[in-house]
């Protein structure tokens, strides 16, 4: 008898319940012919071009992001997963705020207290430890001074410890007249610039730590099947037979192949009025006045922290692997990228702070933006439309001008790279009914290209 991999009981129970409901529904409607929605997309006049001059130069503030992956040598195919992550393009909706390395070894930061004390973790304790990796991540952040390095990058810290505002000026899109403002300046414009950076730029700095693993589908599929059988045994005869047949169908469909599971932990830097005041008072210096004591204080200090907001999980099914190693590597690589994209989309949907702004690329003939399935867009999702303005002090403000809704079945499928053949979860080629490279919205009026949209609950 094959030993089952540990999986979450709640997950199995949810799937089992779904099978029972589906089984009953199929039984009740077996004689009915399936009705397909034949609504077709109307042809839009003209293709929206992302390089159009009206939108190509749009500048808007993005959140900043540092991405990492956890190394676990015990996992199969980990070399392919790590290589894929390190070679993947950086998410284009964020500023690249990479510091440190892109990965760390899980077992270098495992809690060894129990081992030193001669204690053995119970199976339950080990399972809980494997399920939540935030203690190891937190230890890595503390040992490597990741939060300090994030702040150092924001203020363009040099080897001598001097800071400047060049990166804040660049990402804040302040005009040339603001670039000569020193931190010590008491001008209203200088104060506004610093306050603006503190309110929007630095606090919207995140770290996402990924843990991806390559697993066989069969143990999980078998566990779901067995649990369904056990639950069905308590039901009346006809219902029992229907549920078991539904479980068999699902098992046979999902048992072959593999899946890439990704868990992503989302952290945010703790920049606020208090930390800002301490930074400028105790650590700030420029090239005109180097203070070795301040330099050392910043490097050894623990003022800055990364706060865990939460985590999300996503998986991508691999129905089968190719006959040669090259095909296998490519399949695993694509599945890994898709699982990472999926978990980022879940993080944005779950955590409002992590949501990105996207410019409208067109309002006529259609209201459209360059986001799609890769970002987790769904039918009926609502987005607020924001107009960004800059006041006389250079502070950027956002004013809501309306709310728009994603049009049904008009979502850009950007999960596939240009030239890549679209396939379903079983690896079968599929034909996309909606082939335009933008998502269409409806609602409101008076918008213009360049306005920003952001998802709302």
Model-derived regions: residue spans:
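Surface-exposed, polar/charged interaction patches used for macromolecular assembly or partner binding
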Residues: 31-457
């Amino acid at each position: 008898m094959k030993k089952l991999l540990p999986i979450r009981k709640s997950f199995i129970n949810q799937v089992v319940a779904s099978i029972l409901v589906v089984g009953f529904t199929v039984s009740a409607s077996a004689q009915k012919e399936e009705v397909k929605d034949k609504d077709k997309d109307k042809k839009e006049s003209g293709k929206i071009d992302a390089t159009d001059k009206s939108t190509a130069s749009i500048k808007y503030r993005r959140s900043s992001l540092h991405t990492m992956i956890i190394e676990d040598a015990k996992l199969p195919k980990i070399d392919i997963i790590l290589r894929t992550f390190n070679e993947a393009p950086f998410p284009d909706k964020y500023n690249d705020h990479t510091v440190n390395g892109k990965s760390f070894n899980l077992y270098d930061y495992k809690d060894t207290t129990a081992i030193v004390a001669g204690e053995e973790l119970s199976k339950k304790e080990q399972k809980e430890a494997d399920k939540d990796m935030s203690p190891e991540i937190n230890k890595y952040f503390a040992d490597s001074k990741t939060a300090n390095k994030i702040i150092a990058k924001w203020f363009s810290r040099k080897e001598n410890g001097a800071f400047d505002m060049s990166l804040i000026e660049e990402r804040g899109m302040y005009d040339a007249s603001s670039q000569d403002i020193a931190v010590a300046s008491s001008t209203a414009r200088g104060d506004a610039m610093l306050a603006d950076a503190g309110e929007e730029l630095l606090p919207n700095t995140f770290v996402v730590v990924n843990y991806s693993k390559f697993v066989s589908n069969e143990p999980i599929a078998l566990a779901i099947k067995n649990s369904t059988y056990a639950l069905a045994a308590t039901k009346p005869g006809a219902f029992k037979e229907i549920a078991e047949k539904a479980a068999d169908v699902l098992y046979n469909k999902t048992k072959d192949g593999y899946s890439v599971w990704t868990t992503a932990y989302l952290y945010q830097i703790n920049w606020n009025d208090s930390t800002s005041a301490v930074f400028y008072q105790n650590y700030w210096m420029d090239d005109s006045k180097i203070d070795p004591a301040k330099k050392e204080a910043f490097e050894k200090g623990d003022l800055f922290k990364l706060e865990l907001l939460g985590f999300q999980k996503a998986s991508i099914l691999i129905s089968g692997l190719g006959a040669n190693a090259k095909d296998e590597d490519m399949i695993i690589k694509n599945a890994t990228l898709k699982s990472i994209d999926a978990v980022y989309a879940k993080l944005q949907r779950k955590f409002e702070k992590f949501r990105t702004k996207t410019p409208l690329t067109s309002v006529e003939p259609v209201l459209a933006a360059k986001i799609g399935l890769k970002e987790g867009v769904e039918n009926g999702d609502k987005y607020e439309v924001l107009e960004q303005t800059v006041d006389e002090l250079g502070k950027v403000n956002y004013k809501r001008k309306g709310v728009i809704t994603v049009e049904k079945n008009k979502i850009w499928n950007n999960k596939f790279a240009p030239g890549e053949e679209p396939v379903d979860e079983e690896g079968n080629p599929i034909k996309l009914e909606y082939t335009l490279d933008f998502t269409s919205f409806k609602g409101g009026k008076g918008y213009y290209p360049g306005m920003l949209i952001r998802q709302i609950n």
